[in-house]
Design a protein with these regions (language model features):
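Short, glycine-biased loop/turn motifs at secondary-structure junctions and
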Residues: 1-153
Length: 153
């Protein structure tokens, strides 16, 4: 088994991941499939600080194509096109809104001290943003945000 998978499984067990998702994690054969599971369980993962920013830094820092961002400073607006985008310890400006080609409005999650400004992409929609403790978001230029707070149990 891969080192990343061993770590994910150990932390999932220690942090009380439900049996169904734990079994799904055991079946993950690639980082991409593990990321999909992470994004499907993102509320639980962020509430429990799973798997931890240290693991994300070490094993998933190259996962921007999958909507996982870590330690990024966006000087120029970064266009967000994923259905779920998770930012760990990120700062700067992102652009979000309706993705007409994919017919989605992204759900944006900020964790581990992320502070982002979100600007619109030209469509009048409301973008949901989920904030962990210690994170902040500012709406800019033609976007409406619906902000939810994720708290540690």
């Amino acid at each position: 088994m891969s080192e990343w998978k061993d770590i994910l499984l150990a932390r999932a067990k220690n942090q009380g991941m439900c049996r169904e998702n734990f079994l799904a994690l055991e079946r993950c054969s690639s980082k991409e499939s593990a990321i999909l599971l992470y994004k499907r369980t993102i509320d639980w993962a962020l509430e429990e600080s799973y798997p931890g920013v240290d693991v994300i830094r070490q094993h998933f820092s190259d996962s921007e194509d999958c909507g996982i961002y870590v330690d990024k400073n966006f000087g120029e607006p970064k266009e967000i096109g994923d259905k779920v985008a998770v930012f760990h310890h990120c700062n700067g400006v992102i652009r979000a809104g309706l993705n007409v080609e994919r017919a989605i409005i992204p759900m944006i999650y900020l964790a581990d001290g992320s502070h982002l400004t979100v600007e619109g992409n030209g469509y009048d929609v409301i973008v949901p943003v989920y904030l962990c403790e210690g994170c902040s978001v500012v709406a800019k230029d033609g976007i409406r945000l619906k902000v939810y707070h994720i708290g540690k149990k």
